[in-house]
From Swiss-Prot:
Biological source species: Anaeromyxobacter dehalogenans (strain 2CP-C)
Record protein name field: Large ribosomal subunit protein bL33
Keywords linked to the UniProt accession: Ribonucleoprotein, Ribosomal protein
Pfam short name (any one): Ribosomal_L33
UniProt cross-references to InterPro entries, sorted A to Z: Ribosomal_bL33, Ribosomal_bL33_CS, Ribosomal_bL33_sf, Ribosomal_zn-bd
GO annotations of cellular component type: cytoplasm; ribonucleoprotein complex; ribosome
Family: Belongs to the bacterial ribosomal protein bL33 family.
Keyword Transmembrane helix appears in the UniProt entry: no
GO terms of biological process kind: translation
GO molecular function, one term: structural constituent of ribosome
Amino acid sequence: MAGNRSIITLECKTCKERNYTTTKNKKKTQDKLTLSKYCPRCRKHVEHKETK
C-alpha cells in the first residue's frame, strides 16, 4: 500500500535553483510549502518554495 506522502523539490525564490528535496503529506497540507533554507548559490538563507 502506498502512503499519502510524496516527494517534492524546493526551489530558491531569488535564483530559481532547486536545492532541496523533502516529503510532504498531501492530505494534511494541500497548499504550496515554503521554508527558509540556506541557498549555496546566493550564500544566504532565502525562502524556498515547493515545485514539482
